[in-house]
């Protein structure tokens, strides 16, 4: 599934790329005309900089931003807070811990610490922009913003795509060979990767990391199975019935005839949703937008800011619509067909997906519990499988 990417570049990313190339050129010239001792000093300095911690949360710093060494997360949080002139409220005593594991729990205390350690508001306001470039706040991703700019939409989609930890083309060629029936272990391995990919993707897309941690948990606990189905379709996951039943352990714990019939119906429905998505030949950008539409749902229980979540879903839907209109002008019904496929994903039984793919991996531990633990830990979950090379 190919995607035309040349027309979908974030202008700010292009500017950054030009700056990076210029910097690389300067560094190359310096290396050519400097003595070896200078090269060694530069290497030592670079190694030391790699270990600089974010002064806000203690995570690994990506460089100096707005006057202080910070990670990408705190840099983005501070920039958004200042540019939108946001005000937050602390639900505790205005002294919440702000570290790598708790930085998303209280935005008030996080911004307070950003300012306390010396991050400068004025550095955000005068952030560099190319000549004749509209103010980035014009494309600020806030409720009630301007949604008509292609730059805004292409930038949003680019960030969704960049958040993918495992591109579909790298899901293991040994598992994707047509005509070969996957073994039980391969099925469980691929399923673990698909679920891991969904959670890691969510943690790295715009806006989701800035939500209250309780909202993050609620959204993923409700939608993980829908994201799994989308990833299964995108990766062309083979869904042969026999190994699926074996992976589910039905032979070890026999079911009654009625339960077997119901279980098979759920499997067939799951297979149908995957096949219908594959038949539409959905490309990577469309899958990313579809996953964002699914993830940002106001149907999750206990959300702290439902209008904000609804706004994020609307943005994702607008981005998908504009992308389809631009990339598939000869398919006027394509956007509608894609959108109509999403409600059925909610009807795929999450308990059946657990039984089919994860009971051998995690036993009786609910997937929702694993997702919660992964988000609360703030670090990658250690699946018992090697990462894709």
Swiss-Prot record:
Highest taxon above the source species: Eukaryota
Keywords from the UniProt entry: DNA-binding, Metal-binding, Nucleus, Receptor, Transcription, Transcription regulation, Zinc, Zinc-finger
Main location: nucleus
Gene Ontology biological process terms in this record: angioblast cell migration; brain segmentation; cell differentiation; cranial skeletal system development; negative regulation of transcription by RNA polymerase II; nervous system development; vasculature development; venous blood vessel development
Coiled-coil intervals: none
InterPro entries linked to this entry: NHR-like_dom_sf, Nucl_hrmn_rcpt_lig-bd, Nuclear_hormone_rcpt_NR2, Nuclear_hrmn_rcpt, Znf_hrmn_rcpt, Znf_NHR/GATA
All residue ranges annotated as the NR LBD domain in the record: 152-378
GO cellular component: nucleus
A Pfam family this chain is assigned to: zf-C4
GO MF: nuclear receptor activity; RNA polymerase II cis-regulatory region sequence-specific DNA binding; zinc ion binding
Annotated tissue distribution: Expressed the retina, where expression is restricted to the outer nuclear layer.
UniProt DNA-binding region: 51-126
ZnF (NR C4-type) ranges: 54-74, 90-109
Stretches the record annotates as Disordered: 19-39
Protein location: Nucleus
Task performed by this protein: Putative transcription factor that is required in photoreceptor cells precursors during eye development.
Family according to the record: Belongs to the nuclear hormone receptor family. NR2 subfamily.
UniProt-recorded name of the protein: Nuclear receptor subfamily 2 group F member 1-B
Source organism: Danio rerio (Zebrafish)
Encoding gene (name): nr2f1b
